C-alpha cells in the first residue's frame, strides 16, 4: 500500500497506467455473441440517427439517446466495470446524504428550478424523490427517472440490459412508423433500419431473459 506522500510524489505516468489498467477492455467479449449484438445495435442506432438528421431532426434525439445508452452498456460489459458497484446500497447513501444537509443526489438530475420534485407513491422507495423534469428529455410519467435509477441500482446488469432492450423496442417502433409517414427518402431508410434494429433488440431481450432471468425465476419457484 502506498502512503499519501508516495502517491503524491510518484511519476505522473504511473498514475495514468494504473487508471488505464482499471478500464482494460476484454477483447474476447468484443468478439463474443453478446459483444457482436451490442456493436450491431450501436452501429444501426448511429445510422438511424444520421438518417433522422438528414430528414426529420425532431426524432434524432431518441436515436442519439439510445446510442449513448447502448455505448454505456458496451463499456460496462467490455471492461467489466459494473462488478465494482454491483448492488450498491443506495438508500443508505441517500439517507446519509440527506442528513448531512447536502443536496439530494436525485435532485442533481434536474435542470429546472421551477418544477419541484414530488414523491411517487407505489413505485418510489421511501425517502426517494422524483427529479424535476429535464427540458431536453420528455418525462413519460411522474417519477420515471427515479424509478429507472432505482431499478438499475437494485437489479443486476442483465435485468437493466433487458429493460434497455424493451424500452428501445418501444421507442424505435413508434419513431420508425411515425417517420415513414413523411415519405422522405432518408426517413424511409430510417424506417427500414429501425425495423431491423427492433428485431435485433427483440432477439437480444429474448436471449437475456432466457439465460439470466428465467433461471433465477425457476430457482425461486423451487425454493
UniProtKB/Swiss-Prot annotation:
UniProt-listed PROSITE patterns: MARVEL
Gene Ontology CC terms, in alphabetical order: extracellular space; membrane
Main location: membrane
Sorted UniProt keywords: Chemotaxis, Cytokine, Membrane, Transmembrane, Transmembrane helix
InterPro entries cross-referenced by the UniProt entry: Marvel, MARVEL-CKLF_proteins
MARVEL domain: residues covered: 29-213
Compartments, as annotated in UniProt: Membrane
Transmembrane segments: 35-55, 56-76, 162-182, 186-206
Keyword Transmembrane helix: yes
Domain of life of the native organism: Eukaryota
Organs and tissues of expression: Highly expressed in the brain.
Membrane topology label: Multi-pass membrane protein
Gene Ontology molecular function terms on file: cytokine activity
Keyword Translocase: no
GO biological process per UniProt: chemotaxis; negative regulation of myoblast differentiation
Similarity comment: Belongs to the chemokine-like factor family.
PANTHER family for the chain: CKLF-LIKE MARVEL TRANSMEMBRANE DOMAIN-CONTAINING PROTEIN 5 (PTHR22776:SF26), MARVEL-CONTAINING POTENTIAL LIPID RAFT-ASSOCIATED PROTEIN (PTHR22776)
Record protein name field: CKLF-like MARVEL transmembrane domain-containing protein 5
Organism per entry: Homo sapiens (Human)
Amino acid at each position: 500500500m502506498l502512503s499519501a506522500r508516495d502517491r503524491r510524489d510518484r511519476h505522473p505516468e504511473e498514475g495514468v497506467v494504473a487508471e488505464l489498467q482499471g478500464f482494460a477492455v476484454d477483447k474476447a467479449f468484443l468478439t463474443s455473441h453478446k459483444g457482436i449484438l451490442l456493436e450491431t445495435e450501436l452501429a444501426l442506432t448511429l445510422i438511424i440517427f444520421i438518417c433522422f438528421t438528414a430528414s426529420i431532426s425532431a426524432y434524432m434525439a431518441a436515436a442519439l439517446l439510445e446510442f449513448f445508452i447502448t455505448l454505456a452498456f458496451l463499456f460496462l460489459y467490455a471492461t467489466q466495470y459494473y462488478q465494482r458497484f454491483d448492488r450498491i446500497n443506495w438508500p443508505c447513501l441517500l439517507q446519509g446524504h440527506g442528513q448531512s444537509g447536502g443536496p439530494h443526489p436525485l435532485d442533481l438530475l434536474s435542470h429546472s428550478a421551477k418544477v419541484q420534485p414530488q414523491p411517487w407513491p407505489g413505485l418510489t422507495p421511501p425517502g426517494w424523490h422524483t427529479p424535476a423534469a429535464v427540458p431536453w428529455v420528455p418525462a413519460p410519467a411522474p417519477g420515471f427517472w427515479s424509478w429507472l435509477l432505482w431499478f438499475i441500482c437494485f437489479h443486476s446488469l442483465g435485468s437493466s440490459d433487458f429493460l434497455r432492450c424493451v424500452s428501445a423496442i418501444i421507442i424505435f417502433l413508434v419513431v420508425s412508423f411515425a417517420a415513414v409517414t413523411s415519405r422522405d427518402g432518408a426517413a424511409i431508410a430510417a424506417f427500414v433500419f429501425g425495423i431491423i434494429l427492433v428485431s435485433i433488440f427483440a432477439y437480444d431481450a429474448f436471449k437475456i431473459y432466457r439465460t439470466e432471468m428465467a433461471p433465477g425465476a425457476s430457482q425461486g419457484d423451487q425454493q
